[in-house]
Amino acid sequence: GDVYKRQTVMFEDKEEKGREEIIDYALKLSRAGLNVNSSGNLSVRFDSPEGKGFLITPTGLPYDETEPEDLVRILFTDNGCYKAVGSRQPSSEWNLHAFLYQARPDINAVVHTHSPYATMLSCLDEAIPPFHYMVAAVGGDTLPCAPYATFGSVALAEGCRDTLGKDRLGCLLSHHGSVAAGRNLKQAYAVALEIESLARMWMNLKQIGGCPLIDKEEMARVKEQFKTYGQQEKGHEEG
């Protein structure tokens, strides 16, 4: 089984920064209305001398009561299992985060929320269609819904991993909520906000019978456009 052990509250600077960043974004999620109390969870990929793995929020602890030392480190082991290191138990959804990190080297942060509109739409068990070009910002021409499975289960983690595939950064989780990922927490948080915004708009449109959709060819062009979005600004910053 998982091994838990007490760890000191002193961390290397890089790890301390990562722990503080997770708490900062957890509080941002709460302020934005995307999570309530201890619902949802966040993680950041983190490799240490002890091994490769990630830092994740603990289970059952409200974000405004969470301290950096409360976060749990999950280590990937050589035999394909996982080892949890910390004074608390990790989020019940740690499997979901682990499966995404191991399947997608491009993902360095994961945010899981129970935001209101995304959660309502997830209960319809259907994808958000390409009603707006920003659907492509999450990586596809639709925003899919992963099949239902019990929270915290391997089946849920597998379903989420398979639904995201090779390039999507987010999806709904049937009768549950949503998952957002990114190259860092800033991007994962932005994706979580975008999913909730799209869900809110689509929910309102469904009340009046929906709307015309953008075709696959145009969504493909939008996806290509997003690949270079912001690169010019980045070039100016580096120049």
What does each of the following model-derived ranges do?
Residues 6-239:
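Glycine-rich flexible loops
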